[in-house]
């Protein structure tokens, strides 16, 4: 066992001590440009696979540092967004900052940040031009109407009370928090590799998604720093996993 694995196990022990381990931000979604490219990459892949409309209702698992990826969905025309997380990383100031920058990116039909800016981000696309074909039958300008933007911004300020277009639920465990057969697209970005009860999570996603809806998950199978090799964690025993995780909500 190398030094990195030993440090992770010691971190697992510390997690049982109150205040021993702090839950750090997840990274990524604190950047509006990251959220913009992630949402439009998922939407582009969905479009190429037959989902050619703007989804009315979307749900994201593990939004992380901000709910910006789902906000990008709302700015592209979605009407309702469910954000589900197990640890509350986000805050009002961060969400509003990301939202305001997203408005500008959409208004300018900005190209998607590509592999040069985010070299590790998947899925990759053949073109990073703004996907105008997706919005050909939809008036993007209407989605960016000043009154709609202000309404969404007001909801972000009071996100835990309003819950009209945006529902942030943290922590979540019961699939019944979202009505069955009510979501057009369920998506996640580098999240499901952290989930322990994966069967429960997939059952929930299939419960929520409408007939004809889609589930879009980008899963990062790398070690996330648990080992020196990208796939070194594959060799860990169940005991090692348990020791590393400790009392943390996820690893």
What is each residue range found by the language model?
Residues 1-27:
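Membrane-proximal basic amphipathic "stem/tether" segments
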Residues 239-251:
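Acceptor-substrate binding/catalytic loop of class I
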Residues 186-187, 216:
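Hydrophobic beta-strand segment of the Class I
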Residues 173-186:
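A short acidic, Gly/Pro-enriched loop at the edge of an enzyme's catalytic core
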